[in-house]
Amino acid sequence: MRIAGAIKFVIAVALFLLTFYVISQVFEIKMYSNLGNIFARSAPDTVAHPTTKAPRYRCGISKVCPEKHFAFKIASGAANVVGPKICVDDNILMSGVKNNVGRGINTALVNGKTGALIETTYHDLWGGEVGPFIEFLKKIPDGTIVLMATYDDGATKLNDDARKRIAELGSSLISVLAFRDNWVFVGGKGIKTKSPFEQHIKNNKDTNKYEGWPEVVEMEGCIPQKINE
């Protein structure tokens, strides 16, 4: 009887230990599973999300131009240090980097039909003479887009004849351009109306950004392509 009781006791203990082992294993699996879910939820999202890159328009302007228009961006010079910059249809026509700018009025001539560059030049209207500038203005072909930007001083030697010829290109502000003013303009030879593309900042010692010069004036837009003869 004692032996049978001992056997029963051993069997009971073994069953208890087996049951405890099974329960502990199941609990441990669930615990690891729950911890895995927790860490999975808290882990940072490492999936790369595609970013939308802002579109770049021609000449870096802020909008796309309609069909049959040329994008342009133009900036005057900064004091007598940084030259002006003229861009048309994503082509830099004049800039300090291109080394084709100078003191006075900087001018780029562009074919009104194709947008192709015709000529770039500048005329020193502080230390030079206005005569060559007037002759240049006279010879601009009809249908030509004319882009102008001042650098340092573009007004001292301007006379009434030169101002009149620039006004005929569509300028409304050339009559008030004065010593060291900053001015940018886009017009055309043979234009019938005043151009909407013109900006002017007056040289004023109380508001000048640089000592003796106003801040840079910039302008951008879309020039209609010339269609008809």
Swiss-Prot record:
Disulfide bonds join 59-87, 65-222. It is found in: Secreted. CDD domains: ILEI_FAM3C. Pfam families: ILEI. GO terms for molecular function: carbohydrate binding. It comes from the Eukaryota. Residues 68-226 form the GG-type lectin domain. Keywords: Developmental protein, Disulfide bond, Lectin, Secreted, Signal. Residues 1-24 form the signal peptide. One of its GO terms (cellular component) is extracellular region. Belongs to the FAM3 family. Involved in retinal laminar formation. This is Protein FAM3C. It comes from Xenopus tropicalis (Western clawed frog).
